[in-house]
Amino acid sequence: MAFGDKAESLGAEVKTYHLNGMNFKGCQGCYACKTKQDSCILKDDLTEVLEAIHEADVLVMASPVYFWDISGQLKSFVDRTYSYLRPDFFNRPDPCRLPEGKKGLLILTQGAEEREHRDVPQKYEHFMEHYGLHDRKTIRGAGIHESATAEDRAPYVQEAEALAREWCGR
């Protein structure tokens, strides 16, 4: 919450969505977003989130790393963003339907040491790049357990707050 709290204190409008408390399905692979309309055809709690991202200047995704990847909830969200891609996205210089100029932040925590799960940030940085989030950053807290103290978390909080000042300062 450090990024959002700092951004809000700087005057930015912040919308926070807790995916775990939402009722939504993962991508159905129906391709309706490529053949019938320019958005996901499913209508559920995630619809508002997917629409809000079109208006947002910054997309922040945060997740613990569980079993070698982001949480299932965030992965299901990522899958649903397939609807942002144009039908012929592999053959285009502008594969994504999102407006240009957005920034992306991925915040990951993991109990494992730094050397573990190194592929996770790379995978989702590529995702952000593919979606046109050219100004992007990952904050990765390795060795952070539920019992981590405020002192343990301080470097990551400071990094998030500094990035909020850089991206959202007026």
Question: Can you describe what each PLM-predicted range is?
Answer:
Residues 1-86, 146-170:
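N-terminal beta1-alpha1-beta2 submodule of the flavodoxin-like/Rossmannoid cofactor-binding fold
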Residues 14, 135-136:
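Hydrophobic anchor at the start of a short beta-strand
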Residues 89-134:
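Short, glycine-/small-residue-rich phosphate/pyrophosphate-handling segment
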Residues 18, 139-140:
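Residue-level recognition of beta-strand->loop/alpha-helix junctions
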Residues 21, 111-112, 143:
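Short, glycine/serine-rich, charged loops/turns that create anion-binding
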Residues 21-22, 46, 50, 95-98, ...:
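Short hydrophobic/aromatic-rich motifs at helix boundaries and adjacent loops
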